[in-house]
Amino acid sequence: IHKHGKQAYVFYDDSWVGMEPCGERFQSVGFDGLIKCVFSGFECRLCAYAKVPVHELRFHPYLFPVGLNGTPTFSEGGTPEKDAVRYWRSVRRALLRQPVERIGLGGYLHLTQNFPAFNDAIADIADEFRTIKQLHKNGAPYVLPIRVAVLHTWGKLRSWTLSGHFHETNKHALIHINEALAGLPVDVKFISFEDVKNGALKDVDVVINAGRMGDAWSGGKAWESEELVSELTRFVYEGGAFIGVGEPSATPGYDRLFRMAHVLGVDEDDGSRVCHGRWAFEVEHDLPITVEESSLGNLPHLYLTDGDTHVLCAKNGVPQMTVHDFGKGKGIYMSHFHVNPASTRMLLETLLYACNLPVNSAWLSDNALVETAYYPADRRLV
């Protein structure tokens, strides 16, 4: 392609296995750019993260008569301007953290002729995009001193993603966590279990492991490694934080289902504890974390492993969110995570608490419905 004076772009959606933008081989191919169609913030971070000269976002809604779910878009009854603004809100918070070079639309351009409100909405979005792009050009946004590592089997290879769009993978708590993290003022990277064994935790403050027992996101048999458990235990004991969501570190065949139960202060009963009692507890409300109960799950077989574990939320007498001091660090557990503005704020406050930082840290809004980004070079709060 280059031999004929053309450029080669990857459209990252239709066929990508073996050509993951975060893979070691991607750069060697020599692509000139990456195009990613986006509904969500995590997809923007995925695109911007790739090492190519040009990053382009393809916005929704596509210029088609109907949308993916069959509802009218650019046809009678459609309100594409509302769709565009709704998706832009998710995209914008991620772009404030990491920029791309271009934005665009796909489909049949003539369909927009009868939808002037859509054209006006896109003009406004384009103006906002140019402003954000210029802010990044002048200098990077302020980031809190919080370094987060999302831990799963794939590590860096599947940075920011699971396999597809949000609506295709939204049964997994991790995609909700990725979406929340996409717009937060924290440093985020993705590591594998082998990375942990090779010293990856030396540049990390918080590790997040979220998934169901046996899946690649929780880790499955990777947790049979005593070296892995020992390294994470040391990390927390010396001052780090381990946040587990769903069935983190879960694998059968040991005295506890969660291999990190001693750090988390909570475990899940697989039916083998019928003759054991339960620690009594009261829900505590004095920690600086605003719990969003509706975003948490309702796992029925959770129990405390330690009477010193603080329960922040319980349903039907079962703990669903807990905090456990372990050495100089903390183990924090959530039974699930469903992204919304309130739960995103809950995650941010959890990260702040895990790192012993105040919830009223600089350049943060005290309103869960308002997110901010501060650009020191311009002395501008967006």
Question: Which role fits each region the language model picked out?
Answer:
Residues 83, 215-382:
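A conserved amphipathic helix/loop scaffold
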Residues 1-236, 244-255, 259-268, 324, ...:
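Glycan-processing catalytic domains of CAZymes
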